[in-house]
């Protein structure tokens, strides 16, 4: 998975050129958290936004992407994505505090280190924009 990410400022938003795997990882993280039986309060705690905002971003990230494309994202949407990438793995902590890699990979289609690297790239890209 490509872990480099470049953001360009566009007024009070950012233009992100996302590789297909990046858009897919962001979608999977958000949709997994959105699909759990969380109310708005829990979802806001996890990703910083309620169902309506998450659904709107999911709609934009959805689809089978075959090539890189640009997404215009607000800082709030970037925060949602970053939070989802870091929060989703915590839902796979088993008794004893161990991370369940196989169920995570089966459900989300990525390894935890992919989510970690992409979350780190998001922070770096915002800092450099």
Region spans (language model):
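Positively charged, low-complexity terminal tracts
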Residues: 1-129
């Amino acid at each position: 998975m490509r872990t480099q990410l470049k953001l360009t400022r566009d007024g009070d938003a950012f233009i992100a050129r996302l590789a297909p795997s990046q858009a897919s990882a962001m979608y999977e993280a958000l949709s997994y958290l959105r699909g759990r039986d969380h109310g708005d309060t829990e979802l806001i705690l996890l990703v910083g936004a309620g169902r309506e905002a998450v659904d709107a971003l999911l709609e934009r990230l959805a689809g089978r992407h075959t090539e890189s494309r640009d997404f215009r994202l607000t800082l709030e949407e970037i925060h949602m994505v970053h939070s989802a990438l870091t929060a989703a793995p915590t839902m796979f902590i088993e008794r004893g505090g161990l991370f369940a890699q196989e169920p995570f990979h089966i459900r989300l289609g990525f390894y935890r280190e992919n989510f970690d690297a992409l979350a780190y790239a998001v922070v770096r890209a915002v800092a450099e924009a």
